[in-house]
Amino acid sequence: MLSGCATLSKQECLTGNWQAVGFTDGAAGRPADYLSSHNKACSKVGVATDYAAWEQGRQEGLKKYCTETHAYQIGRRGEQMTPVCPAQVTPNLERINADGRIFYSLSKQLSIEQERLNSYQQQYDKLLKRHSVALSSQSGVTEYQNGLSERIKNTTQRINNLKRALQELQRTYGY
């Protein structure tokens, strides 16, 4: 690379395959003004960019970026799409991307709830084995045990609800 923030290496600038660079940028969802970053990088080695070739490649790359499958995959990573897709498909892609972000959020919440359930179950098992009863009376132990049972039940229900919601999204989008 030319510098720590250069978008292209010296060799990429000298090769000058602007259509291929544009395709890569389009497939990554980069906007039209991204070419200015390449201009800056390549001007340091005395190379001018070719806007027409780059934009032609970018438009082809956008066909890969602006798909329902890709919109959902981006959302499943917890990310929003860059607003570079044609206006006629943008609302649908934004909805699908939002569903992907919901999947991401539900998955994170499921992981948290599963960790919580494990913790409750370990506490409950210790109580049953009387390994670490730090309560002063048997009634306190029973009350604590009942509270844990209720937390386990509630957490299990939340986990089941999250799993159902995730399964519904998986059915809708096929994965």
Tell me what each language-model feature is.
Residues A6-Y175:
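Intrinsic-disorder/low-complexity detector
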Residues L2-G4:
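C-terminal motif of bacterial Sec signal peptides marking the signal peptidase cleavage site
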